[in-house]
Amino acid sequence: GNVTSTSSITFTYILMANNAGEYTIPGASIVADGDQMVSNSVKIKVLPQDQGGNSGQNNSSSGSIHSSSGTSVSNQDLFIMASASKTNVYEQEAFVLTYKIYTRESNLQLNNAKLPDFKGFHSQEIEMTTNARWTPEHYQGRNYYTTVYRQFVLFPQQSGKLYIDPAQFQMTIGKPVQSDDPFDAFFNGGSNVIEIKKNISTPKIAINVNPLPTGKPADFSGGVGEFNISSSINSKELKTNDAITIKLVISGTGNLKLISNPEIKFPDDFEVYDPKVDNQVRLTREGLTGNKIIEYLAIPRHAGTYKIPGVSFSYFDIRSKSYKTLKTEDYVVNVEKGAGNAEQV
């Protein structure tokens, strides 16, 4: 049979960054058998020099991440930060609460976490990937490995000074310690790993919630954000006892799920059913983005020509910090007498 052979040559380069920043190392290129081939490029992030290392460390390791020695873990080597994207908001204005782990320890495990109940807020959690992604970060002169533990979008439900209470975490850290036992030195390289239990608490966060301005429109929906509204009707020509459907679509970003349904004033002669609501939204840092679809179903019982007035939709525009009112079109429907008893339900 055919025999093939392959060979490879590896080139290794050792680089040292002169300055902090994000860099892209372009792909290397070679020409083999007349064809040019290019390898992939590599992106790297270089942190500033660590100011929290041990004095015994030399300059070559000053950019790496090291925990302090000993049998304890300091609050500077491991902590969890709770941060709000905004601390001065309006009622119902969305903001993001992030819990982020900062560590200089390489071996840690989260045993238990107790988060506050977010009293005074409506909360929705942002979905995270199942596996934590640790990234290096320079914070207050020291280098850490960090990961986002959990994130929530919060909507304050009342004005005044509200507080996000501390979250409580219980963690276990595996820390290597040197042993003076000659047997340990021979069999284990002179080091053992001890487990250290550590309780961590995040600070309380104050959120200043401003009331919505005075002068709310009579038809204020409770919406806070940026929205549009549109309407459609299934038919303007129908017979008695046929269903008529008007669909309203409120689109935009904000507290979409918390917006009250606009009222359609159907003629008194129509039998009106409860509206059907479909929230097609996704969670973003600004709130819920997408569409709130409301379908209104009514049945005319008598023939005639009827006017269905458009709806008025008022909300608080977070960008202009003012109330805005949007209106949909009126509909005129022609109802003819259908077969059978028009009075039948």
Residue ranges of each PLM-predicted region?
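Surface-exposed interaction/ligand-binding surfaces
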Residues: 1-345
